[in-house]
Amino acid sequence: MPNRDTLFSAPIAKLGDWTFDERVAEVFPDMIQRSVPGYSNIISMIGMLAERFVQPDSQVYDLGCSLGAATLSMRRNIKVAGCNIIAVDNSPAMVERCRRHIDAFRADTPVEVIEADILDIKIENASMVVLNFTLQFLEPADRLRLLEQVYRGLRPGGALVLSEKFSFEDADVGELLFNMHHDFKRANGYSELEISQKRSMLENVMLTDSVAAHKTRLKQAGFEHAEVWFQCFNFGSLIALKSGAAA
């Protein structure tokens, strides 16, 4: 059983900005399951997408890998030879635990876990790249640059999976889905205090975009095709494809 997230169950006098530190890493599996509707579905489907898109003798990238859930899902489903998964996160606490999680499962596809800024990672010979709830934590000015790097590094026929919390141009729809997400967290045992304190810590560091903004940026980066393949309330995932037959 994962450690239960009780980080914000008592009042915190001075709330700083959110960081993926040791305390968060320790309870992260419980936190994300109880906070992100559809998370388990996204993780399992990323594995199915890997079976479809990962090409022989190519690289697979999990950028902002946290504890490696997407990496493990892809590794379980990769059926071709000569692949290597590169999992990257800038949180030392996440990287340490991710390495332990990866080492606990045997598989043919090797995984390299790197502690680094994902903007500094050279994407090359990639058939699949995953950004699972990562882009929203980058400065908006850096987002297009990262997606351009991903596009350049993808092989023809390669895929990017981009999962995010969405904002909405229609205020009424945005309010409805915000409230449904609030209900989801309450139903999973979070108190009003926990919800409000976490939201206050995240508001300056997690800056969300609309689906339309994501699609526009993906097109600017070079992707010929992009569409939402999964959504639950204000959370979802897009797939973006680089045209051309797989090599």
Curated annotation (Swiss-Prot):
GO biological process: tRNA wobble uridine modification
Catalytic activity: prephenate + S-adenosyl-L-methionine = carboxy-S-adenosyl-L-methionine + 3-phenylpyruvate + H2O
UniProt entry keywords in alphabetical sequence: S-adenosyl-L-methionine, Transferase
GO molecular function: carboxyl- or carbamoyltransferase activity; S-adenosyl-L-methionine binding
UniProt enzyme class: transferase
Lineage top rank: taxon: Bacteria
EC number from the UniProt entry: 2.1.3.-
Binding site for S-adenosyl-L-methionine: 39, 64-66, 89-90, 117-118, 132, 199
Assembly behavior: Homodimer.
Function as written in the Swiss-Prot or TrEMBL entry: Catalyzes the conversion of S-adenosyl-L-methionine (SAM) to carboxy-S-adenosyl-L-methionine (Cx-SAM).
Family annotation (HAMAP family): Cx_SAM_synthase
Recorded family membership: Belongs to the class I-like SAM-binding methyltransferase superfamily. Cx-SAM synthase family.
UniProt protein name: Carboxy-S-adenosyl-L-methionine synthase
UniProt organism field: Serratia proteamaculans (strain 568)
Gene name for this UniProt entry: cmoA
